[in-house]
Amino acid sequence: ICDLDIKNFNTDDIKYTTLKRSTLINFLKKDLGDIIKTGFKISKINDQEKQIKISFENNVTKECDYLIIADGVFSKSKNLISNNKVKPKYNDTLAIRGKLTKFPENVNKKNVALFLGPNFHHVIYPLNSNGDLNFIAIMKHSLSLEEQGNYSLFSENSFIKKILEKVPQEIKEYVTGIKELKIFPVFVSDEFLKIQNNNIHLIGDAFFAFPPSFAQGASQSIESAYELFMSLNTDKEINFFKKRANKLKMINFRSKFNLFAFHLSNPLIIFLRNIFLKRLVKNKKFLEYYLGRIYKTWLLDISLCLKWSIGTMLPLRL
């Protein structure tokens, strides 16, 4: 439909990048050593005392001044705090992810390619300097309550085959040969949880999970961690929730709108959408307003977070 040069959002030392999430995670944790303890399951959180008391399933109890909850969209810790009052909901979409072995002729291996279709969109982008390409697609698909809770369903060959048969005909050739294929349901947040104890904070998807359209999950997790770190350092943590909630409301609205626009099926509306897109990507004021407020903030906060946590800057390049 059109081209958008994401490098326009770069500065001299802060640049947009694409990479595999596991690569970023390994980079961030490589110098942490044994600081992170794993294998613990929280059974109870008592936040009524001056210090927060955390009970684990192995009968171990710990007390702490601050509790930072970052255990994802299905956060058990968040459920314990809210007494299961705040639950994510199924977004009526499935995500299909994998590494491409066959490359479409119209894909630039050094750029991000977004393809739009009725009730389906997919993105292809480089993972590394070796030319490996990642494939991620979002497909409209209804699931019953039973299917939503059946996690083994999404790895069953019969289910995978049924889903792949529904992808657009023009991409079936290279989707069928995908490596490391994963299909999973997309769950999103419906509301924010304001915790009364100002020493307990949510970050990442535990704070709020979006519909998938801005590729913002990992970026927002890093950004929220950095903002919380700065808030704690300056004794302004009481403002952290309000600041994050306001930012995330904006991103959530735009993510929902993008998903709607990406999945249009009416030919006339699609025709009009494509005309608007061709014009809008050339409008610097629109890009600055609609994308710049999100991407430039992400890039700045992520680069500062990486500098703080590792002591050096991760080389980022599109």
Language-model features, listed with the residues they occupy:
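Conserved N-terminal helical subregion
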Residues: 1-101, 142-149, 153-157, 300-318
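Short beta-strand or tight-loop elements
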Residues: 38, 50, 118-120, 182, ...
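C-terminal helical "tail/cap" subdomain of flavin- and related membrane-associated enzymes
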Residues: 173, 193, 214-219, 226-318
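Conserved protein kinase catalytic core
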Residues: 77-78, 210-212
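Histidine-centered metal-chelating micro-motifs
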Residues: 74-75, 95-97, 120-123, 207-208
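FAD-binding beta-loop-beta segment adjacent to the flavin cofactor pocket
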Residues: 184-211
